[in-house]
């Protein structure tokens, strides 16, 4: 399992920071994991699965 920081998620998905957090609040994007003081990350496989779902919806 690999964690992605926000910058990596933004690069991987081409989404902005605000779009990622908006989609999370709408339950339309994987939730972040709290790693400690002001540090969050996403599970890479969950982000990959989300991207695959988007591709299949076209």
Regions flagged by a language model, labelled:
Residues 1, 8, 27, 31-33:
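Flexible, active-site-adjacent loop/turn segments at secondary-structure boundaries
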Residues 1-19, 46, 53:
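Polyanion-binding surface elements
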Residues 15-19, 30-37:
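Amphipathic, hydrophobic secondary-structure cores in small proteins
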Residues 22:
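Base-recognition residues in the alpha-helical recognition helix of bacterial helix-turn-helix
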Residues 26, 35, 39-57:
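C-terminal structural segments of small proteins and small subunits
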């Amino acid at each position: 399992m690999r964690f992605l920081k926000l910058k990596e998620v933004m690069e991987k998905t081409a989404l902005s920071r605000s779009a990622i957090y908006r989609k999370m609040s709408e339950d339309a994007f994987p939730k972040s994991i709290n790693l400690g003081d002001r540090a969050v990350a996403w599970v890479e496989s969950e982000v990959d699965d989300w991207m695959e779902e988007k591709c299949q919806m076209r």
